[in-house]
């Protein structure tokens, strides 16, 4: 129990007892799908570039695809039907072929949106120059074990220091300016258990913290200036912690395959709130935080997109993926990735990807 801020805790408890209020009008704007009847193309990662105008996606297709958000929304405006259906080949501005299936993407800070990093199923971290459309950096230090997550820190101006989490049970911290054989640090959150590191994220506000989600059912927060031991252990999930995201410098959101999200205080490690409603028992379904609106988006194994407001434990908005194409007959489809556009205050954009390769763009605005 947090005795330092009793008034704040009382406010949180009162909000938990309130009924969730629907303060946002969210609607489906654009659906991007392929006319090909080829095998499933799971979208495992979605990222906006620093301008918030380019969307990159990746997954098992061995391609990083790039879309212009304004053109996707423009298609919707032209159609006049409420929802615009666009073929992937037309909507995709360009793509880069990769040597392996990808699990994660992240734009490298300080590159002007020119360099994007990726983690793949073969245990390799690569960076690509988008102007040349060629790889410019490669690290193979996870022993061939799948890399689940990559991220970069903005702390202290060291914008090129990155980290990767892998099935090998480690978080590797590295600097792309240094030779591949050199490492800033190696962290084993679960110790000798070597449980998979499923997610890593640095504090996007520039603080010295890096959060880690592990298959040992715990989350961890480290100070990058002292990586020997975690500054905080987040214990409360009953299954794998698949995602961890900073809401701000003082709170972290985790997702677990126990079917819930949890909001934590970085100050003392207590659970502020638990969020339930979506279905997640096995797969990676995505987690994204819109910091300006304090909204969390995640996918679900019932093929729906869920949005939670930090103030309430039940979803404030739910929408199902529309069946598209020849793959729509499968009852095993699920929403596999989500990403909020960070710009805006009273308007928002959420992009979600499915296990069938379908990309859906949602737009919303705050109700008067």
Swiss-Prot record:
Subunit structure and binding partners: Interacts with UVR8.
Q: What is this protein called?
A: WD repeat-containing protein RUP2
Q: Which Gene Ontology BP annotations are present?
A: chloroplast organization; flower development; regulation of protein-containing complex assembly; response to UV-B
Which interval of the chain is the signal sequence? none
Q: Which UniProt keywords apply?
A: Cytoplasm, Flowering, Nucleus, Repeat, WD repeat
Per the record, what phenotype accompanies loss of this gene's function? Small stunted leaves and early flowering under short days conditions.
Gene3D superfamilies with a match to the protein in the record:
YVTN repeat-like/Quinoprotein amine dehydrogenase
Describe the function of this protein: Functions in association with RUP1 as repressor of UV-B-induced photomorphogenesis mediated by UVR8 and HY5. Plays a crucial negative feedback regulatory role downstream of UVR8-COP1 to inhibit UVR8 function, balance UV-B-specific responses and ensure normal plant growth. Is involved in the regulation of photoperiodic flowering and vegetative development. May act as negative regulator of photoperiodic flowering by suppressing flowering through the action of CONSTANS (CO) and FLOWERING LOCUS T (FT).
Spans of WD repeats, please give. 38-77, 97-138, 141-184, 192-232, 236-276, 279-318, 330-368
Q: Induced by what?
A: Circadian-regulation. Expression increases during the dark phase with a peak at the beginning of the light phase and then decreases to reach the lowest expression at the end of the light phase. Induced by UV-B.
What is the protein's major site of localization? nucleus
Q: Which GO terms describe its cellular component?
A: Cul4-RING E3 ubiquitin ligase complex; cytosol; nucleus
